[in-house]
C-alpha cells in the first residue's frame, strides 16, 4: 500500500475520477517497511506522469512516430490453451480464467495477472466478472516484495476514497475512467501507471464460497527500451500531478483544437456522381480540424451519409478513402458520436480532430455515389503551420466491406478461424483507431472472438484479447459514447441487425516499423452469417497501405 496513506490516496484517485463516494472498507496488516530509493527531480526522467498526460491529449504528437523506443503489448485473461496457430486450441474461448501464475506473497495465495521487468507504463486496464468482486488487487513496483498499492475489489469502479472535497462533484467520470454504468463491473481505466523497473499485479480472492470464479481482464502497456528512465507511480506523483490529471480529464470530455490558422471551405449541391473538391493551402502545413455538413432534403439520411465517399490526398498520394458515415466513427447509419478524435451529431454534421500534416499540397474530395439522390454538402478545414521532422507521419483511413462472413459457435474450436480485420504494411506507422460494424443475421451476440494483433516479425501476437465487447471497453451490449470507445448503434436487444463499435487510441497506440496484422476470431453465441464493415485509422509513412481496403 505505498502503504497506509498510499492505498487510500492511490485508490482515492480512481473514485474521484468516478465521482463516487466510498463504500468499501480498507483493511491491512502493516508489512515490513519498504524503503524506496531516493528519487531525483522529475525533470531528470524521460517519462513522468505529466509527460504521459501531455502526450495523451496532444493531437500533434499523435502524428509522429515515438521519440522514445517502446513496444505496445497486451496482457489478458485469454485462454492459455491458445499457443499454436492452426490448432483447435488456438480458438479456445475460456477467457475468464487465464493468468500468468500462482504464487504466495506474505502468506497470501495470489494469482499473478501481470508481471513486467524494466521500464514501462500501463496505458489501459479493463476488468469485469460475473461473480462477486470480493477480491484484493495488489500492485508491486520496481521489484518490491511488499505491495505498494492495494485495491479492495475486482472492480475499477469500486476503487474509492477522495482526494479532496473539490473533486466530489466534478465531471471526472468518463474521461480517464469509463465506468460500466449499465453492466456490473465492466469498466476501463486510462490513467497511465508508469514504473521504472518492473510492475507486478496480483489478485487475492476473498470469498471462499466462490469456486474458481471467472476474472476477465485486459491490461495494455508499453515496454520501453532499458535506456529510457521512467518515474514510478507513487503517492507523491499523484499529488504533484493532481491539477494536470483534472485538466486532462476535462479535455478528454471536451476536446479543444487550435483556433488559429487559415480557414478554407467549399460547398455545393451534389447530384448523383458529382464531387465537391476542397484544395488546401500549399506548403508544409497540417489540417488541425475538418468539418463536414450534409443536408439531405428528402434523401434518407443514412443513405446519404453512406453514399458520400470522402477521399483525401496529400503530396500527390491518396491516404483516406471512406464513406462519411464510417469516417465519422459511427459506421452505417451515421449515428451520433462523441469521441476524442471525432464528433458527429447524427444529423449530417461531422467534426474531425485528426491532425493531417503534409509537406507540399493536399485536398479533400466528397463524391456522391448515389444513383438517384441529390444532397447539399459543405467541407471546411482549419490549416496551420506544422513542423515536419523525421518522426512525422501522414494520416490514413481506409474502409472495407465483407459480405456473408461466417460466425462460428464460440465453443466449436475445431472450426474456428481468424478473419483479417486489417493488415497494414509498407513502412512505419502507429495504429490509432478502428470502427467495427457487424450486421448480424442471428439473434444472439456475434462478438465472442478474440483480437490478435501481430507487429512486424512477432512469432506470437503481442495483443491477444478476450472478445469484441472487451476490446471496445463496454462489456454490456449497450449503446454508449466515450473518448476512446463506444457503441453508437445497437439495432435490437437480441443483437440482430447492426452492432457498431469504435475504438480510438492515444497512449495505447500501436507502433510498427514494417507491418501490423490485426486478426479477429469470428465466434458468437449462435452460428450464422453476418455482413461486416470496418474502418481503420493510422498514421504512417506515405506509402503504407491497408491490404484489401478501398
Each language-model region and where it sits:
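A broad, structure-centric signal for solvent-exposed, well-ordered loop/edge residues
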Residues: 8-9, 226
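Bacterial N-terminal signal peptides
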Residues: 9-19
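Beta-strand-centric surfaces of beta-sandwich/beta-rich domains
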Residues: 34-550
Amino acid at each position: 500500500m505505498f502503504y497506509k496513506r498510499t492505498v487510500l490516496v492511490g485508490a482515492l484517485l480512481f473514485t474521484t475520477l468516478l465521482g463516487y463516494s466510498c463504500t468499501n472498507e480498507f483493511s491491512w496488516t502493516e508489512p515490513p517497511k519498504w524503503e524506496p530509493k531516493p528519487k531525483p527531480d522529475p525533470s531528470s526522467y524521460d517519462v513522468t506522469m505529466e509527460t504521459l498526460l501531455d502526450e495523451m491529449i496532444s493531437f500533434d504528437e499523435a502524428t509522429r512516430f515515438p521519440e522514445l523506443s517502446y513496444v505496445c503489448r497486451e496482457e489478458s485473461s485469454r485462454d492459455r490453451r491458445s499457443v499454436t496457430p492452426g490448432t483447435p486450441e488456438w480458438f479456445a474461448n475460456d477467457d475468464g480464467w487465464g493468468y500468468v501464475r500462482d504464487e504466495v506473497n506474505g502468506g497470501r495465495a495470489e494469482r499473478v495477472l501481470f508481471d513486467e521487468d524494466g521500464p514501462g507504463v500501463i496505458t489501459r486496464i479493463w476488468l469485469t466478472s460475473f461473480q462477486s468482486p470480493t477480491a484484493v488487487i495488489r500492485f508491486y513496483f520496481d521489484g518490491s516484495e511488499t505491495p505498494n498499492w492495494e485495491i479492495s475489489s475486482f472492480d475499477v469502479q469500486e476503487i474509492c476514497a477522495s482526494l479532496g472535497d473539490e473533486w466530489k462533484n466534478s465531471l471526472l467520470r468518463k474521461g480517464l475512467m469509463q465506468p460500466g454504468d449499465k453492466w456490473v463491473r465492466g469498466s476501463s481505466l486510462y490513467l497511465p501507471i508508469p514504473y521504472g523497473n518492473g510492475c507486478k499485479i496480483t489478485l487475492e480472492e476473498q470469498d471462499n464460497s466462490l469456486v474458481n470464479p471467472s476474472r476477465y481482464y485486459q491490461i495494455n502497456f508499453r515496454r520501453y527500451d532499458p535506456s529510457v528512465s521512467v518515474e514510478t507511480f507513487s503517492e507523491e506523483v499523484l499529488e504533484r500531478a493532481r491539477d494536470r490529471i483534472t485538466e486532462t480529464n476535462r479535455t478528454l470530455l471536451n476536446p479543444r483544437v487550435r483556433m488559429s490558422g487559415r480557414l478554407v471551405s467549399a460547398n455545393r449541391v451534389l447530384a448523383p456522381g458529382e464531387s465537391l473538391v476542397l484544395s488546401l493551402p500549399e506548403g508544409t502545413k497540417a489540417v488541425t480540424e475538418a468539418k463536414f455538413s450534409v443536408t439531405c432534403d428528402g434523401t434518407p439520411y443514412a443513405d446519404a451519409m453512406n453514399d458520400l465517399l470522402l477521399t483525401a490526398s496529400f503530396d500527390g498520394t491518396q491516404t483516406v478513402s471512406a464513406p462519411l458515415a464510417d469516417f465519422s466513427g459511427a459506421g452505417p447509419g451515421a449515428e451520433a458520436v462523441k469521441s476524442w478524435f471525432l464528433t458527429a451529431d447524427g444529423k449530417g454534421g461531422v467534426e474531425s480532430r485528426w491532425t493531417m500534416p503534409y509537406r507540399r499540397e493536399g485536398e479533400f474530395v466528397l463524391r456522391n455515389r448515389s444513383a438517384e439522390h441529390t444532397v447539399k454538402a459543405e467541407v471546411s478545414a482549419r490549416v496551420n503551420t506544422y513542423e515536419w521532422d523525421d518522426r512525422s507521419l501522414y494520416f490514413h483511413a481506409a474502409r472495407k466491406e465483407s459480405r456473408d462472413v461466417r460466425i462460428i459457435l464460440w465453443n466449436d474450436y475445431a472450426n474456428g478461424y481468424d478473419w483479417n480485420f486489417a493488415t497494414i504494411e509498407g513502412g512505419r506507422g502507429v495504429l490509432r483507431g478502428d470502427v467495427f460494424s457487424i450486421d448480424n443475421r442471428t439473434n444472439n451476440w456475434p462478438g465472442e472472438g478474440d483480437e490478435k494483433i501481430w507487429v512486424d516479425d512477432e512469432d506470437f501476437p503481442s495483443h491477444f484479447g478476450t472478445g469484441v465487447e472487451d476490446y471496445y471497453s463496454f462489456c454490456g451490449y449497450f449503446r454508449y459514447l466515450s473518448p476512446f470507445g463506444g457503441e453508437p448503434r445497437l439495432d435490437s436487444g437480441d443483437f440482430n441487425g447492426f452492432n457498431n463499435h469504435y475504438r480510438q487510441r492515444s497512449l495505447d497506440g500501436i507502433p510498427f516499423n514494417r507491418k501490423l496484422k490485426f486478426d479477429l476470431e469470428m465466434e458468437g453465441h449462435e452460428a450464422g452469417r453476418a455482413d461486416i464493415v470496418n474502418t481503420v485509422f493510422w498514421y504512417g509513412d506515405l506509402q503504407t497501405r491497408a491490404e484489401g481496403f478501398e
